[in-house]
Amino acid sequence: MEGSKSEAVFDSMNLNPQIFINEAINSVEDYVDQAFDFYARDASKSLKIKGSDKQKSQALSNGIARVRGLLLSVIDNRLKLWESYSLRFCFAVPDGFVLPKSEESSSVHQDGLYDLELDAELDSLRDKLNVVGKRSVELDSELQALERSSVSRERSLRLVNEALELYDESSMDEIFKEMTKMASELRASVERLKTRRMKASESAKVKRLKNHGKEFSAMTFDGKLEDLEKFQAELRKM
């Protein structure tokens, strides 16, 4: 934006977008430093690392420094994109914008008058910058969520493929043979059970017939007609 029309316009209004951007970036870096200072204190407390244990303390510091470096690398890339976007779109002067004449400008500064319309535009510009900043945070959160979801899907797919490899064609043949064998054994068991039941039924009938024969022998001598009819009915049931 250096040497451009936009720079001249902002200079005429005693504004410097680059200073605003630098202050925003410095604020982000300050927040990161404070966050990692708190993280270092809390980690030492949670891990019960005392100041006298220099080896563990140094290992913790090295680990935190590495994580901080990775995080700052990502944040720096994001802030560079945000800075480029802001300078290109948010601080771009619209086509047709005309600077006031020097005499008019000096008279305005001398009289201490302010252009209300320009103040409204500046307020609108600040609001847009806030919206862009919030949207940038939301996009970062969405990107992290997508990355976590992608890792989870890849892991699930890998587990499914490993499970499918266990059930190849040879395994299915073995399972089918085992099921056929079990079905044959079950059929043979059912047939043996039916045979035992038939033998038991026939044995019971023979036993009943013998018992009725004895009763009939006794009836032939002193039995009544009703007893004979009852015996005949029992034989018919058999």
Curated annotation (Swiss-Prot):
Gene Ontology CC terms: chromosome, centromeric region; MIS12/MIND type complex; nucleus
Location in or out of the cell: Chromosome, Centromere, Kinetochore
InterPro entries: Centromere_Mis12
Swiss-Prot/TrEMBL keywords: Cell cycle, Cell division, Centromere, Chromosome, Coiled coil, Kinetochore, Meiosis, Mitosis
Ranges in a coiled coil: 117-149
Keyword Oxidoreductase: no
Any Pfam family the entry gives: Mis12
Keyword Cell cycle part of the UniProt annotation: yes
GO biological process assignments: cell division; meiotic cell cycle; mitotic cell cycle
Primary location recorded for the protein, binned into one broad class: nucleus
Changes seen on gene knockout: Embryonic lethality when homozygous.
Function summary: Constitutive component of kinetochores that is essential for proper cell division during mitotic cell cycle. May play a role in the modulation of centromere during meiosis.
Family stated for the protein in its record: Belongs to the mis12 family.
Protein name (database record): Protein MIS12 homolog
Source species: Arabidopsis thaliana (Mouse-ear cress)
Gene name of the record: MIS12
